[in-house]
Regions:
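Mid/C-terminal beta-alpha module of Rossmann-like enzyme folds, strongest
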Residues: 203-254
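Conserved Rossmann-fold NAD(P)-dependent oxidoreductase catalytic core, especially the SDR/UDP-sugar
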Residues: 93-133
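C-terminal amphipathic/interface module of NAD(P)-dependent oxidoreductases
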Residues: 50-55, 250-277
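NAD(P)-dependent short-chain dehydrogenase/reductase
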Residues: 148-191
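NAD(P)H-binding glycine-rich loop region in Rossmannoid oxidoreductase-like domains
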Residues: 32-37, 41, 45-97
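Alpha-helical substrate-binding/gating segment
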Residues: 173-183, 189-216
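Catalytic helix-loop patch of NAD(P)-dependent Rossmann-fold dehydrogenases
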Residues: 120-159
Length: 277
């Protein structure tokens, strides 16, 4: 099976590494950083340096592929123009070149649950209205729409709305390293949704095996409040306690509890259904 992974950062590289162990897969990996070519050649048969605005390079990537995994993220900036260039422009250019690549039967995109916006801690599922809290969230909604519109009888499009990503090399203590011993605004009762790297890799594998299409949330079973999560981390690793200042309220743009029932109903079994403290 010929598979291309567009965007080999933390997630894309892990998917490539997993598939590289399976002789059934011929992997094409892309990077925007030429210096990473030799590293990626250890987990892919072919490496192409390509940016999302380079239609010629994308056309070379998708030719003769059976499946595409789109796993991209801005390198350094959270500015809206960086998000637009990384996500929306890449999606539009990819859809354009896929029209000339009939061999591609499936496109899998690793998106974000941030498209739901602030639901004040309410539960949401894949049918819930999308109310992104900022311009970056709106760009992610538009990116989903562009990709979903490309689906047809020949091409299945599967979108994973990922929780916050953690795992080997991206441990929770590293993610929150600046929080310990500090005072954070609010009460800490806002909810966050997480997903382990192992489950992202396994879910992508699952999606290819079952030829999934449509939208699926990919998050752990039970969302945790920020206070609970940081308290648990502080206790386990003997780190300074995080304090909260209710007088300094801060709007949390992604305060929702995200359901993972749909992917479970499809037959996926989580490796880490609970957050690994």
């Amino acid at each position: 099976m010929n598979v291309a992974i567009i965007g080999c950062g933390y997630v894309g590289t892990a998917v490539a590494r997993h598939w590289h162990r399976d002789r059934r897969y011929q992997i094409t990996a892309t990077t925007t950083t030429p210096e990473r070519t030799s590293e990626l050649e250890q987990v892919a048969q072919r490496v192409i340096v390509a940016k999302g605005d380079d239609e010629t390079a994308l056309k070379a990537v998708v030719q003769n592929q059976d499946a595409i995994v789109l796993s991209i993220a801005p390198k350094f900036s959270l500015a809206a123009n960086s998000y637009e260039a990384t996500y929306l422009h890449t999606a539009k250019n990819l859809v354009k070149v896929l029209q000339q690549a009939p061999s591609v039967k499936q496109l899998i995109y690793t998106g974000s649950y941030s498209v739901y916006g602030n639901k004040n801690g309410a539960w949401v599922d894949e049918e819930s209205p999308l109310t992104p809290a900022n311009q970056n969230g709106e760009i992610l909604v538009q990116t989903e729409q562009v990709l979903l519109a490309a689906a047809n009888e020949n091409l299945k499009v599967c979108i994973f709305r990922l929780g916050g990503i953690y795992g080997s090399g991206r441990e929770l203590t590293k993610i929150f390293s600046r929080a310990f011993g500090s005072t954070r605004p609010g009460t800490g009762e806002d909810f966050s949704n997480w997903i382990h790297l192992d489950d992202i890799v396994a879910a992508v594998d699952f999606a290819v095996a079952l030829q999934l299409q449509g939208i699926y949330n990919l998050v752990i079973d039970e969302p945790r409040s920020s206070r609970d999560l940081l308290d648990r981390l502080s206790q386990k690793y003997s780190l300074p306690t995080v304090m909260w200042d209710p007088s300094a309220q801060e709007v949390r743009p992604y305060n929702a509890r995200v359901s993972n029932q749909k992917i479970k109903a499809a037959g996926y079994s989580f490796i880490h259904p609970q957050i690994m403290i």
